[in-house]
Amino acid sequence: MDCTLVDSTCVVERAWGCWANRHDVSLEAVLWFSHGRPTIATMEHFLPGRDHAQELDEMDRYEETELEGIVAVRGAMQVVGALRKHPWAIVTSARRTLAEARVTAAGLPLPKVIVPADEIRNGKPDPEGFLRAAELLEVPPKECLVFEDTRPGIEAGMNAGMQVVAILTTVAANKLRHRPFIQDFRDVTIRPEGDHLKVDVIQVRLPDK
């Protein structure tokens, strides 16, 4: 969701900046590790063996109320608009309340299916979230198309047996191991074709060897 549909970089950096400063942890390292992972996974990675329940709750409350500056990524409004009458889902490492708050703040409509981190056991790169979304959408995984911007997310989609297109908002092309990628959703057009949707991914490129 973050940096795939919505750009919440300003809020995320402020939240993790406070946390990193409090614990004398490198903010750069925290931001690199945290993207695409549940908040609790990042806290446990840098400060293992602690009870993070209170800090997790505090960060969630902060992020759910600090929404200024959150916008839709380029092209997202057009793509989501084309999906209004068709099944699509958000699979996110955020909690449900945070996901709904950020999508709404960005001016995007909410899909009927959201699979947040607090409703599954295993986060990305485990495929559980994507498989759950396919189940709720009643669509076979092999017929699902995933757009992801992080390596854990890309791996999760692949592990679910889905087709994956990477978005170069946070991951570098030379890190994609020959996965197709786009710059942003302006490279994508969606149109109905009978009972199905035809997705044209324009300017799909493969990373150089």
PLM-predicted stretches and their roles:
Residues 1-86, 95-100, 108-109:
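N-terminal helical cap/lid subdomain that shapes the substrate entry/recognition surface
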